[in-house]
């Protein structure tokens, strides 16, 4: 039976921590100041990692999708330096190739939350209109 917290998961978690620290202390690009690594997925051979990012202060709508694409490109351009920093701090034979992807789960969760609140308000208005609730 596989270990509950496998080596792959431990490495992914460690990569997440190290990149978050690097973004705070080693990357000086102002466009990446409010970047958070939400999670990392590592391939089975540990040769590549998909890094899911959230940009604080940006919500996913038509106006900001271009800004998100620009920031992802900036992160991808810095991926060599980030890999170098990972190689210095992590003891791995091969440092995974990094691919940065925007994590839409937060904006999707906010959207779902707004829909639920809208439905609750409409139900409450309907109940008041029908005299069921004051």
UniProtKB/Swiss-Prot annotation:
- GO molecular-function terms, A-Z: ribosomal small subunit binding
* Keyword Nucleotide-binding part of the UniProt annotation: no
Recorded GO CC terms: cytosol
Gene3D superfamilies from the UniProt entry: 3.30.300.20
The alphabetical list of record keywords is: Cytoplasm, Ribosome biogenesis
Q: Where is this protein chiefly located?
A: cytoplasm
Does the keyword Transferase belong to this entry? Answer: no
For biological process, the GO terms are: maturation of SSU-rRNA
Q: One Pfam annotation, family name?
A: RBFA
Q: Which domain of life is it from?
A: Bacteria
Subcellular location, record wording: Cytoplasm
Read off the PROSITE patterns from this record.
Answer: RBFA (PS01319)
Q: PANTHER family under this entry?
A: RIBOSOME-BINDING FACTOR A, CHLOROPLASTIC-RELATED (PTHR33515:SF1)
The annotated subunit structure for this chain is: Monomer. Binds 30S ribosomal subunits, but not 50S ribosomal subunits or 70S ribosomes.
Q: Which family does it belong to?
A: Belongs to the RbfA family.
HAMAP family to which the protein is assigned, alphabetical: RbfA
**Role description:** One of several proteins that assist in the late maturation steps of the functional core of the 30S ribosomal subunit. Associates with free 30S ribosomal subunits (but not with 30S subunits that are part of 70S ribosomes or polysomes). Required for efficient processing of 16S rRNA. May interact with the 5'-terminal helix region of 16S rRNA.
Q: What is the protein name stated in its UniProt record? A: Ribosome-binding factor A
Q: What is the lineage of its organism?
A: Bacteria, Pseudomonadati, Pseudomonadota, Gammaproteobacteria, Candidatus Palibaumannia
**Which gene is this protein's source?**
rbfA
